[in-house]
Amino acid sequence: RPPPTIPGAPVVGGLLRFLRGPIPLIRAEYARLGPVFTVPILTRRITFLIGPDVSAHFFKSNESDMSQQEVYRFNVPTFGPGVVFDVDYQVRQEQFRFFTEALRANKLRSYVDQMVAEAEEYFSKWGESGTVDLKYELEHLIILTASRCLLGREVREKLFDDVSALFHDLDNGMLPISVIFPYLPIPAHRRRDQARTRLAEIFATIIKSRKASGQSEEDMLQCFIDSKYKNGRQTTESEVTGLLIAALFAGQHTSSITSTWTGAYLLKFQQYFAEAVEEQKEVMKRHGDKIDHDILAEMDVLYRCIKEALRLHPPLIMLLRQSHSDFSVTTREGKEFDIPKGHIVATSPAFANRLPHIFKNPDSYDPDRFAAGREEDKVAGAFSYISFGGGRHGCLGEPFAYLQIKAIWTHLLRNFEFELVSPFPENDWNAMVVGIKGEVMVNYKRRKLIVDN
């Protein structure tokens, strides 16, 4: 009972369609073949599992049955040697423990203070009124915030321009061709490798300086410096650099993209903007102007607005695993398929998040679908909403991301009126992390919320 295979030239047919865009391919074949189908790409076979009925094994399997390492090894030149997908599962789990420690609630509390301070400083430079590209502004604010919370005070205060330029070269060195040929000697890859070497030198200097002076900071860099493996070994400078790069890559684009989509939808649908503003007034009645971790956690309306933007536009449109054992799946219609070991297995948040049997009017922006009484993502069971992945490999940075986006939009809702003046944006399907095409131009006007006590 093998999955149906898409028709076409057996070697390059699937590759050509895949490179033209995975979402049109998935949309066409889901309609024709159903939620389980195989796409031959060169010598590999990618089997798609679309929807919670068939994707549970993808999310819940042990690493020995379904692994990330082989399919994400293209990240190794970017992250560097000795971290994440360049190490075996046991070491990778220990490194993920370092991430978990760096994202604990007590750490998040200190990060929120830094997020709020960065937002206040950034938007203080805006005038009384004006027109800005919201996408550009939020991209810049989020890299500033990430520099402060993740990379540390030294980078934020003294080396920001240098480090930003180097990360830009790393970023531009991750192209669709990089997934298949990560070491291809092209100019973008050469610039990527040079940037990675220079970043290692910069962070080695900072780490040595911190250790020599005995100073300790409230940032992710410090968490990684202080981390130890179970055998007592300290992290090396190279490992710390690689883990920081991985953290920034995981969070920077995804947060700036989602912040921008959240704003675009709030400005398009004024009833939700009004609800979000009203929520801010209620919060301010209780807490005044103060913003901290616990106060942000009270903002359910804003949370649902962000979550719905992320449902419609997950920046990671495909998740991949390498299958090391045979397994079977059963569709909700009762059809069974056997997937052999050796296949790459894929699912797509961008497509699965819009399945009409899970989400009512799936292409509509409706944050209330997550409100008490509806909770469409829970009614359909686990793995219905997969913008942050799920199961054994759910996104460790989910709480950080929500706090960061909430901190930004809390400040904006309290201090500005907006009007979207460019056409509503579209997805930029050409990017590895799917962002927003073109500018998102908005008029802003400064104002203060008046709260009736």
UniProtKB/Swiss-Prot annotation:
Any Pfam family: p450
Transmembrane segment boundaries: none
Gene3D superfamilies from the UniProt entry: Cytochrome P450
Documented EC number(s): 1.14.14.154
Coiled coil: none
Gene Ontology CC annotation, any one: membrane
Residues binding heme: C395
Primary location: membrane
CDD domains: CYP51-like
Documented effect of changing I450V: In clone W516
One MF term in the entry's GO annotations: oxidoreductase activity
Membrane topology label: Single-pass membrane protein
Subcellular location, record wording: Membrane
Task performed by this protein: Catalyzes the 14-alpha demethylation of obtusifoliol to 4 alpha-methyl-5 alpha-ergosta-8,14,24(28)-trien-3 beta-ol.
Similarity remark: Belongs to the cytochrome P450 family.
Record's protein name: Obtusifoliol 14-alpha demethylase
